[in-house]
Amino acid sequence: SVGFKAGVKDYKLTYYTPDYKTKDTDILAAFRVTPQPGVPPEEAGAAVAAESSTGTWTTVWTDGLTSLDRYKGRCYHIEPVAGEESQFIAYVAYPLDLFEEGSVTNMFTSIVGNVFGFKALRALRLEDLRIPNAYVKTFQGPPHGIQVERDKLNKYGRPLLGCTIKPKLGLSAKNYGRAVYECLRGGLDFTKDDENVNSQPFMRWRDRFLFCAEALYKAQAETGEIKGHYLNATAGTCEEMIKRAVFARELGVPIVMHDYLTGGFTANTTLAHYCRDNGLLLHIHRAMHAVIDRQKNHGMHFRVLAKALRLSGGDHIHSGTVVGKLEGEREITLGFVDLLRDDFVEKDRSRGIYFTQDWVSLPGVLPVASGGIHVWHMPALTEIFGDDSVLQFGGGTLGHPWGNAPGAVANRVALEACVQARNEGRDLASEGNQIIREASKWSPELAAACEVWKE
């Protein structure tokens, strides 16, 4: 017959290719697919590959004007999920040509843009991505990375300490700056704007930036250490965001901050480029991540958002605390913590890593442990996260019965005690509480903190 064969045809005829050998330049995705009852897994997997690449619901004559074989996504492997009924991991390979260079935005629009509302699927979750070297190389990545940050701050051989200034909303700029000064003076390396502190009626951004810079320089002069405050540059428009970053640079401060999910990847990459060009470190907060990553069977795993951030650019990113949670969660969290810091990460399903990822010397990102932690957690945090991390104690500093500066002292003493004990070969996991107790004998600030938050 003349012409093409019109009509709706099964996706799996075109997009399910179990014999396909993946290319080094392909972007690989692992999806957790929950098909609707009656939809075979091959069809569901193929549908995901089709809808997130070249497919549409019916055959169109313009298909003849291009080479589908060159541009289509392919579902190349499907495996059932152990212990789950009717859940499958579908592996999809995308040819590199489908993506714009250096654009996380375009990568996500393609891979997760449309397909999550697909009728044949009950639920869909993107578990992991393998970014090929050829694509990684089109990104600048983190503005500076772990080593450059240590050199800028002159801080080595230990995790860095931070604190989010609370109450997060309602303080005037001057009182806010005062809290910043007290924490830094007490011994923290960083203080932090809360993620929702942008520029509100009770405290406009410019006033906050000025008072925080003043606090920072005063604390720096008195302690002889380099200090930082994450000035949140997140704003309603990219122009306004850059304006704030420029002002931060003019004040000479070391670091600014961005909410990368609410701000969006385009804004984040823009800011990351500015930060590298102007010597600013960039702290990233993950506000809104749970909207995307909390459901076990739908959405995107945080390790994908973390990989995307390393491409887009950031020097620190919040990544959970691990402490006091389930053992399994610890392995998974350490999996994406390594994906943030290391140059090369092996596939390891027990840690949730579906693909071997080579970052081809893209700088690393410091993971930030933040939320509900206090001095008794210090040994565990030091052991789990190691030196290349930022430990943030908000309430764990400001909640100290004697005030902010003693709270900061308590945290710094606890950290130094843990690092020293570890370097002497002691086991932080089993002797942690004892190490803290010994240290509190000669630090009244730490002793008071130990009283407030029981082990």
UniProtKB/Swiss-Prot annotation:
The record marks 325 as: Transition state stabilizer. Keywords: Calvin cycle, Carbon dioxide fixation, Chloroplast, Disulfide bond, Lyase, Magnesium, Metal-binding, Methylation, Monooxygenase, Oxidoreductase, Photorespiration, Photosynthesis, Plastid. Binds 1 Mg(2+) ion per subunit. The modification N6,N6,N6-trimethyllysine is found at residue 5. Pfam families: RuBisCO_large (PF00016), RuBisCO_large_N (PF02788). PROSITE patterns: RUBISCO_LARGE (PS00157). The keyword Plastid applies. CDD domains: RuBisCO_large_I. Coiled coil: none annotated. It catalyses: 2 (2R)-3-phosphoglycerate + 2 H(+) = D-ribulose 1,5-bisphosphate + CO2 + H2O; D-ribulose 1,5-bisphosphate + O2 = 2-phosphoglycolate + (2R)-3-phosphoglycerate + 2 H(+). GO terms for biological process: photorespiration; reductive pentose-phosphate cycle. SUPFAM superfamilies: RuBisCo, C-terminal domain, RuBisCO, large subunit, small (N-terminal) domain. It is an enzyme of class 4 (lyase). The active site is at 166 (proton acceptor), 285 (proton acceptor). The disulfide bond which can form in the large chain dimeric partners within the hexadecamer appears to be associated with oxidative stress and protein turnover. Its cofactor is Mg(2+). InterPro entries: RuBisCO, RuBisCo_large_chain_AS, RuBisCO_lsu_C, RuBisCO_lsu_C_sf, RuBisCO_lsu_fd_N, RuBisCO_lsu_N_sf, RuBisCO_lsuI. GO terms for molecular function: magnesium ion binding; monooxygenase activity; ribulose-bisphosphate carboxylase activity. GO terms for cellular component: chloroplast. Mg(2+) binds at residues 192, 194-195. Substrate binds at residues 114, 164, 168, 286, 318, 370. Belongs to the RuBisCO large chain family. Type I subfamily. HAMAP family: RuBisCO_L_type1. The basic functional RuBisCO is composed of a large chain homodimer in a 'head-to-tail' conformation. In form I RuBisCO this homodimer is arranged in a barrel-like tetramer with the small subunits forming a tetrameric 'cap' on each end of the 'barrel'. Heterohexadecamer of 8 large chains and 8 small chains; disulfide-linked. The disulfide link is formed within the large subunit homodimers. This is Ribulose bisphosphate carboxylase large chain. It comes from Lupinus albifrons (Silver lupine).
